[in-house]
Amino acid sequence: MYFVNKLVIAMTAAAFAPPASLAQEAPLKIGVVTFLSGPAASPFGVPARNAAEIMVEMLNGTKVPAPYAARGFGGAALQMQLVDESGPATTQVTEFRNLAQRDNVDMVIGYVSSGNCLAVAPVAEELKKLTVFFDCGTPRIFEEKSYKYVFRTASTATMDSVGAALYVKELKAGKIKSIAGVNQNYAWGQDSWVDFEASMKQLAPGVQVATSQMPKLFAGQYNAEISTVLGAKADVVHSSFWDGDLEAFILQAGPRGLFKRSTVILTTGETAMYKLAEHIPDGVVIGARGPYGPYAPDNELNRWFSKTFADRYGVPPNYAAYQMAQAILGTKAAWEKAQAANGGKRPSTDGVIAAFERLTFESPAGKVEMVIGAGHQAITETAYGVSKLVKGKMTVANVKRYPATMVNPPDGVKAADWIANGFKK
């Protein structure tokens, strides 16, 4: 009788206990932050949101090619909670706290603005919330502080600036006497120009800075800056403008002849090259912040992603879309590596962090290596080309690629020091 009662109790307990896989199958809540309103929404935020929606839907439906064919993250379905990145950094800090403390998301993936990343990173550390920056470019994130809970799966502005300098030196056959800059007056624009100027002085000794213009972010009107740059008559003009500022700059600078007077570098120009094709003359140097968009490799993941995105939204994915997809896939790779190390059980945040550090993973843009910033900062190759209109369609010509180790500093070395030391490893 004792045995029977014990058996009944055991069977009853088993009947009402949650299945062993329930914790594993509980959905993961991901806070996704990008611009959904304002001047940065159309060229950056909306494409990034669209990419996030595709990735979440397709991962949940096991429709992503290998090595990401497993459902969600390690079998757990993904739930996305969108937050608008518009507004000052103080607003973004409040929204981040809401995601972490009120909504109890498992992780946050987001942020286009370098200012927002700088503001959010210490809060992520304070709240011990796994946070993956997908786009913002300032190298200051991991140069000025060390973070346990923060990762960035896209390269920094240093890569863009060094790559641009290497490209334009070759394009101009070394015949560059003067350079000028028009960049937004905050972390991204400042860092981009500092690294480009320093790189040019290494690659073209004796080059002079004709002028450096730093209008405020989202200023919208740039006639005064354009007049100054035209008057400076620089051989090369560098701009890291993005969002609506980039589009406004193109529309204002083109009719005034800036693109014909100087070789102009638009390090984020890919986001405007299709929309403003008729306003961009041949020969403008176009960047995409890495091997994205027209510079993306011909691999299975890219063929799948670019077709899926274009079929759904009617336009090709721009680099913001690629970077969002890259962040989600990188986080999935880290999660599943941690899960495997945990015997197939749902990993802890510490386990995911350990797996993420120094991780190498594949993306639609090719190989991504988390090897600087103590293993929290990605490096990738990059590419540049010049605009060329072919049968009414904007393309890039004279494409040059630069390996990741050629355009990114080694781990533990600040970008400024690396450049000043002649890019030595």
Residue ranges and their predicted role:
Residues 28, 282, 360-425:
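Solvent-exposed, acidic/polar segments of extracytosolic/periplasmic ligand-binding ectodomains
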Residues 31-55, 59, 83-89, 112-113, ...:
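Extracytoplasmic "Venus flytrap"
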Residues 2-22:
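Gram-negative bacterial Sec-dependent N-terminal signal peptides
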Residues 253-326, 336-342, 397-424:
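Extracellular/periplasmic periplasmic-binding protein-like sensory domains
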